[in-house]
Curated annotation (Swiss-Prot):
InterPro entries: Rab-GAP-TBC_dom, Rab-GAP_TBC_sf. The gene is GYP7. Pfam families: RabGAP-TBC. Residues 385-633 form the Rab-GAP TBC domain. PROSITE patterns: TBC_RABGAP. GTPase-activating protein (GAP) that most effectively accelerates the intrinsic GTPase activity of Ypt/Rab-type GTPase YPT7 involved in vacuole docking and fusion. It is also active, but to a lesser extent, on YPT31, YPT32, YPT1, YPT6 and SEC4. Provides a catalytic arginine (arginine finger) in trans to accelerate the GTP hydrolysis rate of the substrate GTPase. Keywords: Cytoplasm, GTPase activation, Phosphoprotein. The keyword Phosphoprotein applies. This is GTPase-activating protein GYP7. Its main location: cytoplasm.
Amino acid sequence: MSKILFCKSKVFLHPTSDARDNIAGFLLLTLEANKLSHQAILQYIPESGLSTLEISKLLKHEAKVGTCPTSTPFVIENSINFSNLVNTSLGQAFEISLSQIYCIQFRPPSPNGWYVGSLVIYPLTEQFTGFQPPVLFFHDQLCPSTTDKLKRLRKSMNPFDDSDELYWGGVDLRNKINELMELKKSNLEPEFWLVNPSLNDLRNFVSKDLLESYNNSKKDTTELATAGVKLNEKFQEWKWNVMSKIADVTTKSTNFIDSWLTNNSPIQKSQIDNEYLQKLLNNEKVKQIEQDYDSARVYLANWSLGVKQEAERYQKQNKLFDSYRNNIFNDLNLTDELSDTEINNALQRQFPLTEAKWNSLWDENDGRLRVTVNEVKDFIFHGGLENDSLRGKVWGFLLEIYPWDSSQDERVQIDQTLAAEYDQLKLTWSKDFLQFDDEDEEEYWNDQLFRISKDVRRCDRNLEIFQYNTIDGLPPPPQQLPANENNSTSPESANDESDDADDGVRNPHLIHLQNILITYNVYNTNLGYVQGMTDLLSPIYVIMKEEWKTFWCFTHFMDIMERNFLRDQSGIHEQMLTLVELVQLMLPELSEHLNKCDSGNLFFCFRMLLVWFKREFEMEDIMHIWENFWTFYYSSQFQLFFMLAILQKNSQAILQHLNQFDQILKFFNELNGKLDWNDLMVRAELLFKKFEKMMHVMERDLQNVSSSSSSSSTGVLPCQSERLTLLLSKKPIIRHEGQRSKNSVK
């Protein structure tokens, strides 16, 4: 039994040039019961193989689903055996699964009616060697569903479909396939649409690099009409280039101002002979500017960075790919170190992993992954995940709840086991089971509960699900709101109870967070609860929703992050030392300048690394950043390269404007909400590739030195640094807290 998803009549085969030989038929999309959408079958059945009753039934289905919106439910067909029809249609019929199609060429009809629209199907060669489905021709003037829609469009004075293309019968099929699985238009040949493309297909055939040549090929009589728009785009591009240059000039000009103000101290002013200059320097306004110059430095640094970021953001949003590429190329000082492929792969981040694509990666029989894990991670790292619904499925794999090689049945068993284990862990801290051997343990436990409750009440209260501390999580009635609750931007002040209130947490989602953290305290008794864990837990809960699943994702995340929270701080200290060495190698000028500013230890980076930039970005951005990190696509410590990208991005502002520790600390503290995570991820990837090549070159040089008996090594090459070498590893660094004792400092 199959479901008819799409039906189009009067689709013809043209076996000869004689129109009398044309073969009329039906083009169908069907789906067997209990099959996934990407397993839908595209079928062509000639009318000659159908009875009058069957033709009548199909025409009724065409009226229902041929041009219906996506919300229309599937119609189940019981009386037509499609496979039998295909097999008995004398070789004129065919069927092919959508998952077996590489691409489809949709050739629209001639506007003047000289030829009809058609489509050409290109199967995957490894699955259909020697088989080429015939070209299908859409005789729209004979098809009832197409003519009906054309009448409606003409009546509305709009002959175009939703994508602003001239409507014809093939558009309906294309839209329906796009509902079922990923369908991407090629900029190289606009008539070609890739079906469920791989990431390499997207890079090769839907590349932004092709945008300019594609636009040039589209020039026609509309060129004059679009000239004004293009001129405006050119002006906008020029404007942002100029603004970016102004920021650079301002950066350089402050060198003169800095020198001038430094050399004109009160003692030196008396030595200046110029009467006018003396009068100017004695002016009260000038003195005030001089006294406020430290804060002005931070302002100038932020301003120049802001202009630069706005210019880059405009270039990306308006497809000015070459300009953005050149900016990155110059900023990172890339010469011939990286190949064009490496640079393009880093820059092309516009292809997220979609739900349809994700579903197509799994075997329909046992639910096992059909592609390599690296291919999936490539999609995630370079494009992210399409939406939160998909994150709820994928994060379980990234956080190792589910093995990548598991089957669907095995994952169901894992869910049942982990849910039961979580319930057992929760029981251990319930009032009926909780007992203490001594007063110290009881005091420690109560202190942990207090800390958890206190931090949970402060956790991401700007998010809707955590905003109101009410029993149902909804806004309280207006009469119950304090006077200052009219300001919805500060729900904490209106809804929070005092820190020592026993029933302070009422919001059901906050209660779930509290339960998870208390259970983790039992699960990892040596570490317990440490401030900052709520920052790590909140995004996972927002996605997973279920308490038990959130808990296990969090525990696996904490396996990676536990070294950041060790009591002796050795884990985070080791990362800071690694970052210092990395900056010395990759950004030597910045490293030297920071040392002069007493900031060479990079203390201002501490908080960012501690909770993986949670405080610097919005929730949606953090989800993108973390799922990139969790892939370990290049390195298990890729967060250090992301931090390196932040330093590199701001290096010119620091070098030219800031020269004191407190200025630098203030500057980085004010970066919250000002950073572009996507741009930083591009820079981080290119910096890693550059670092990787540098390490390989230095390792080769070191081997050459070692093999030469006449050579003697002086100093230590960077590749001999264990910390830097470890950055090339994809294996997570796991460090656990030691045994907790009564004397442990919490």
